[in-house]
Amino acid sequence: MALSPQLFFALYVSAFALGFPLNLLAIRGAVARARLRLTPNLVYTLHLACSDLLLAITLPVKAVEALASGAWPLPLPLCPVFVLVHFAPLYAGGGFLAALSAGRYLGAAFPFGYQAVRRPRYSWGVCVAIWALVLCHMGLVLGLEAPGGWLNTTSSSLGINTPVNGSPVCLEAWDPNSARPARLSFSILLFFVPLVITAFCYVGCLRALAHSGLSHKRKLRAAWAAGGAFLTLLLCLGPYNASNVASFVNPDLGGSWRKLGLITGSWSVVLNPLVTGYLGASPGRGTVCTTRTQGGTIQK
């Protein structure tokens, strides 16, 4: 299904207009709560919101690029910077959502054991590891696949390429023989692994909630807190990464599906702040996952 450039433009602009202020509010709310008590989930939320803020900043460029039918609108040397700032948060977001889900699952299934070892400094270490994994993998793959450098105008370049119509294109003119395996490796390591972790933790949270003493209403709230990350991964990041797999299996399936996947991925900047639930400016408000077990209560 092919969408018009005007519709792509409108979707990118809408994602930016909603996602940018939402993530600013999420950061504000998380910082306000962290001043009272810093928890592992607050650390993950802050990194996720900052990551989404970076992604949101690039969306106006994607909007102009879409309106120009893929032509690169900025000076040529900014292409590699844009690729890094746009795609690193897109892949890192899955890791932060998986970390949030793991924290909720461990708190629900093993409240006392997890309470004894949950320390914010461990969460900072996890976040640094996620960023390092994403950036190192991107640098390694992109560096190996660009033997002539980012601004080489050959067909194997990852950066600027000049197609037949004479307009410069950033990244999308990447040689398909190099792009397909590279994008597949990104998706397997940085999406499908976090997706499996998130799905496992979601099922574990549901089992723990089923045996908890919470009311039906609070069970629904806790189930949303646990399942929101899984839904965001599926709905926002799933189509883009599915297109990477599809284009590897059948090269003819990649083009328009990938463009749609980038659109849904951009809307993760809108859904993620709603999933984390730290939009309120007041430290005393916000959606938290609270699980009451046989011997006590744990709050994350």
From Swiss-Prot:
Q: How does it sit in the membrane?
A: Multi-pass membrane protein
UniProt xrefs under InterPro entries: GPCR_Rhodpsn, GPCR_Rhodpsn_7TM, GPR40-rel_orph, GPR40_recept_FA
Sites carrying sugar chains = N152
Please report any disulfide bonds recorded for this protein chain, giving both cysteine positions: C79-C170
Kindly list the places in or outside the cell where this protein is found, as annotated in its UniProt entry: Cell membrane
Instruction: Report the leader peptide range.
Output: none
Q: Which GO terms describe its cellular component?
A: plasma membrane
Keyword Cytoplasm carried by entry: no
- Identify the domain of life: Eukaryota
Instruction: Please indicate the ranges of residues that lie on the Extracellular side.
Output: 1-8, 65-79, 143-178, 249-256
Q: Which residues lie on this side of the membrane: Cytoplasmic?
A: 32-41, 102-121, 201-223, 280-300
Keywords annotated in UniProt: Cell membrane, Disulfide bond, G-protein coupled receptor, Glycoprotein, Lipid-binding, Membrane, Receptor, Transducer, Transmembrane, Transmembrane helix
Q: Give the main localization category.
A: membrane
Q: Where are the transmembrane segments?
A: 9-31, 42-64, 80-101, 122-142, 179-200, 224-248, 257-279
Keyword Transmembrane attached: yes
Q: Name one Pfam family in it.
A: 7tm_1
In this chain's numbering, which residues are marked as the site (Important for receptor activation)?
E145, E172
Q: Name one GO molecular function term.
A: lipid binding
Q: Which family does it belong to?
A: Belongs to the G-protein coupled receptor 1 family.
Known function: G-protein coupled receptor for medium and long chain saturated and unsaturated fatty acids that plays an important role in glucose homeostasis. Fatty acid binding increases glucose-stimulated insulin secretion, and may also enhance the secretion of glucagon-like peptide 1 (GLP-1). May also play a role in bone homeostasis; receptor signaling activates pathways that inhibit osteoclast differentiation. Ligand binding leads to a conformation change that triggers signaling via G-proteins that activate phospholipase C, leading to an increase of the intracellular calcium concentration.
Under which name does UniProt file this protein? Answer: Free fatty acid receptor 1
Where does this protein come from, organism-wise? Mesocricetus auratus
